[in-house]
Every structure is written in structure tokens, then in C-alpha cells.
Amino acid sequence: MGQKVCAHGFRVGPTLIKGWDSVLYAEKHYKTLFIQDLKIRDVINKGFNQAQISRVLIERPSNKSIIININAKKPNIIIGRNGSEIDKLKKAIEKMTSLKEVYINIHEVRKFNIDAAIVAQTIALQLEKRVSFRKAMKTAIQASFKQGGQGIRVSCSGRLGGAEIARTEWYIEGRMPLHTLRADIDYSTAEAITTYGVIGVKVWIYKGEYTENKRYN
């Protein structure tokens, strides 16, 4: 089971170790708000893809307000000069949601080498720049262990190296207890758009076991 399902989704729940990316309560308009959250996330990820965004957490404490927490490797790109970019984003979200109380919090990811989303995006960017996929994967693995990772698995799928036939290659180092629900495993995917076609990148990073005070990070 642990080998097949998404490592993050497998651990989401009030009694488990991962939290939801959208926090809201709505009896009648849940579908509308959920689709709205997806659109907001899409605008942020596509508009600031150079910032290497790790996570977008959207909270709706009331019907009149929305709080958006963005974790990124390069927060300055999202903020812009004198806050110009974040002001544009705020106005776009106000127009999209018809809410006047829009709060955006930007957080810098300091240990980005053990953040699966950022690692996957970094590998994808290197593949687009024609760096060898083996070199990109091995570099990511080495950097992960330097920042405290206890295990990492990286997979690349597609026409690797311009080969005629698509294939999948992966590397794994350290522990990767996918069946252990208390294991803190970060998982993410990314796509590299190359001249040979799309190459899919998957990253799993094991950071140790959860304790009570480490939950919902």
C-alpha cells in the first residue's frame, strides 16, 4: 500500500502527521471554494515559478477573509521591488474571490535541500538546461544528506538523454519506510519540458520519525 499511494496523502488526517493545504468549512459552497483554492494555487505557482514554491496553504477563518501562506526558496521574487509583485497578487486574489480581507504571508524555506517540492523543481530546471539526469539526481541526493535528510529516493521518467525509447531510472540512498505512518516523508513531483519531450521527476525525502510536537509542520 505504502509503495503505491502518494506519501503525503497517505499521512493526511487529524490523528496522523500531515495537515491539509486548504483549511475551510462550508456546508453549501464547499465545491465553489475548493475550485477557487485550486485557481489561486495555479495563479501563484505559474506566476512565480522562478521562486521555487514549496507549499501554498490557504485558510478561510470566516466568510469575509482569506489567509494565504506561501513557502518558497526565493521569497523576494514573490514580494518584488517595494512589495509591487505581492500587491498585484493581492489585487488579483481580491478580484477572484470578491473578498476585501486578503492576507498573504511569505515564508522562506531555509532547508530547501530536504524539501521534496524544491528538490524536484531544481532537478527539472537542470534537465531543461541539458544537465545529465544522472548528475542532477546524484547532486540532489548528496545535498539532501548534508542538510539532515535520512533517506532520499529520486525518479526520472521519459526520453532520458534523448533516447528513442522512454524509460524510468531511479536512485535511492538511506532509509525510506513508506509503510510507516509516523515516518516524516516528504513527496513531490515536477515536469521538465525538454526538446525531446516531457520528463517527469519524483522525489521522496525521509526526515525521521514524527513526535507530538513535530506534527503539522
UniProtKB/Swiss-Prot annotation:
Top-level lineage group: Bacteria
Alphabetized GO MF terms: mRNA binding; rRNA binding; structural constituent of ribosome
Keyword RNA-binding carried by entry: yes
Domain (KH type-2) ranges: 40-110
GO BP annotation list: translation
GO cellular component, one term: cytosolic small ribosomal subunit
Alphabetical keyword list: Ribonucleoprotein, Ribosomal protein, RNA-binding, rRNA-binding
Function: Binds the lower part of the 30S subunit head. Binds mRNA in the 70S ribosome, positioning it for translation.
Family named by the database record: Belongs to the universal ribosomal protein uS3 family.
Assembly description: Part of the 30S ribosomal subunit. Forms a tight complex with proteins S10 and S14.
Protein's name in the database: Small ribosomal subunit protein uS3
Organism whose genome encodes this protein: Rickettsia massiliae (strain Mtu5)
